[in-house]
């Protein structure tokens, strides 16, 4: 494979955005229904920090980035899964959030049926993008799909974490690992796999970043919604697990520092 190393973070972000736009454009071609296509575009752009896909690309970069297209597809698929989870998480059945990334959530901007279909379509698109670029490296593709689906399904992924919100009691650390850290772990492991390297040494990095990210998000849930860009105090209103609610603000800060 030809090596192609990112020289700057800006270069990485620009190529990532180009790839995301291309994926959404391909999914929006005729005979795609215009409203659903618009909802998918709305869910992806403008993006947030793109932490997960950039983390995946950074790991690929550190591993030599010997298959640029596959590493980029891996990063795009991680972001697609993440955005799909946000669309579903914001629905009235879950958080009933009205604002995400400083604008109305998908079900508010469109409607609930389109939001459900949008999330579902992004999940499928994540797999499509990955397989399209992975056929040239089948030995890596199988591992990538396994990591991505494991991190999003049952019993180790986002769906499992979301499901725990319906239980009466839950260990906060386990909840954070499943709902948030699992996709960060996927990002680091997929970054390594797509570059032909062993993913396991990178798993702990994803785990720690993911847990820290969720605790920080829990703290942000009690901040000003104009600053955070999303609906706040939803965890308290919906009785969701939250580090601040369980540990107090200072306890949550200490937990963040310990991670």
What are these regions (language model features)?
Residues 1-4:
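Conserved small/polar residues in nucleotide/adenosyl-binding loops
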